[in-house]
Amino acid sequence: MKNLNCFIFIYLVVPLLGRAQSTFKIEWKSWSELEQSIKEEPKPVFIFFHAKWCSYCKKIEREIFTKSEVIAKLNSKYYAVEMDVEETDTITFEGRKLTNKQALTKRNGVHEIPLLLASRERFPFSLPATIILTKDFTLKKRSFEYYTSKQLLDFLK
């Protein structure tokens, strides 16, 4: 009987637990949602810039942004925004229209928003780029490398 109960638990309950965890995700916001949310309840902002061709970005999305402690921290303490740097849509934020002007002249052109927030003097634009802004949109921290979940949690302190 013990073996039967164990069998039932393993084959019926454990898969359900896995499915329940997979629905616990980072609550990513669009730029317009961010603008509205900040007005209603000011919080710091976590921004993750990525591209389809960036292997370290994909690894962060797959291995770090799926960790429950990372998800819980981001969802409770920050507004999270993720953006493909090659986005071609015009984004209106705080009354300013921002576009990907490079898309007209360059392959893999970068949108104005990541260029404004993640460019560095004397360094080429690089990914992954992670930005923390205060609730007043002042730059607090930036990271331009792959990180583990522990490193990200330390970065978020």
List the predicted regions and their residue ranges.
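Short active-site neighborhood of thiol/selenol oxidoreductases, capturing the structured segment around
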Residues: 41-55
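Thiol-/selenol-based redox modules, centered on thioredoxin-like
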Residues: 135-157
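Typically the conserved alpha-helix immediately C-terminal to a functionally engaged Cys/Sec
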Residues: 58-73
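C-type cytochrome heme c attachment motif
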Residues: 52-59, 128-131
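Thioredoxin-like thiol-disulfide oxidoreductase module
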Residues: 70, 79-127, 134-136
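Bacterial Sec-dependent N-terminal signal peptides
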Residues: 1-23
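Solvent-exposed loop/turn segments at secondary-structure junctions
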Residues: 51-56, 64, 85-90, 137-138
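A short beta-strand-turn-helix
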Residues: 27-45, 74, 114
